Regions:
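Catalytic-loop of the protein kinase fold
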Residues: 54-55, 59-99
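A conserved short helix/loop substructure at the end of the activation segment
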Residues: 169-181
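Short, structured interface segments
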Residues: 21, 91-93, 180-182
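Short, solvent-exposed loop/helix junctions and linker helices
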Residues: 48, 52, 127-133, 176
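Extracytoplasmic/periplasmic ligand-binding sensor domains
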Residues: 3-8, 20, 35, 57-61, ...
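C-lobe/activation-segment region of protein kinase-like
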Residues: 85-167
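Short amphipathic C-terminal alpha-helix that caps PH/PH-like domains
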Residues: 55-58, 137-144, 182
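Conserved structural core of kinase catalytic domains
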Residues: 4-52
Length: 182
């Protein structure tokens, strides 16, 4: 078993999505990897191509989750709810698994909830997909603030990411209404 020097890698129960003939099905799996938050704390430097790949994969997972759940939100789109597998996959933590109870406790803390979950009074006025878009936008912002990207982002990339985050969070007049727009 491959063990990280600081022993952060372990087994997690995650959600996987299977695409078949235009349909999407959700399944559960157990993978070896680490939480995104642990990766960020342990190694704050990330390759630009890898980071952009993570951003894309998170958006794809969120879109697949919504299609499989008939528009249902994941609700835990934050660095604690994302697992990076040893194979390089970006996966959503299975929030209903007893094996992930310790991580779920971390996600229930006020500091995590207040940063990544849209306030209740705003939820009443937003569409069904906006809570996950809000979490996605704040997760991107958190990652960009916390991690050093190598090679550095160009000014154009910074502006583009700033706009994407703003549209996800709802800080601009033009908001995303679906992950297909991201």
């Amino acid at each position: 078993e491959k063990i990280n020097a600081v022993n952060l890698e372990k087994m997690y129960e995650v959600l996987k999505f299977v695409e078949y003939g235009g349909y999407c099905r959700r399944s559960m799996d157990c993978v070896h990897g680490m939480l995104l938050i642990d990766r960020m704390k342990n190694e704050a430097v990330v390759d630009k191509a890898v980071l952009f790949g993570w951003f894309r994969k998170m958006a794809v997972c969120a879109e697949q989750y919504e299609r499989c759940g008939e528009g249902q939100n994941y609700k835990y789109l934050n660095p604690y709810g994302i697992v990076l597998s040893d194979e390089g996959e970006v996966l959503f933590l299975d929030t209903e698994s007893r094996e992930n109870a310790e991580v779920m406790k971390q996600m229930q803390k006020r500091a995590v909830r207040s940063h990544f979950i849209r306030p209740v009074y705003e939820m009443d006025t937003c569409g069904s997909r906006e809570p996950d878009l809000f979490g996605y936008g704040n997760t991107l912002r958190f990652m960009l603030a916390y991690m050093k990207v190598v090679p550095a982002l160009t000014k154009r990339e910074e502006i583009r990411l700033f706009r994407i985050c703003g549209k996800c969070i709802g800080e601009t007049r033009k908001k995303y209404s679906s992950f297909l727009q991201v």
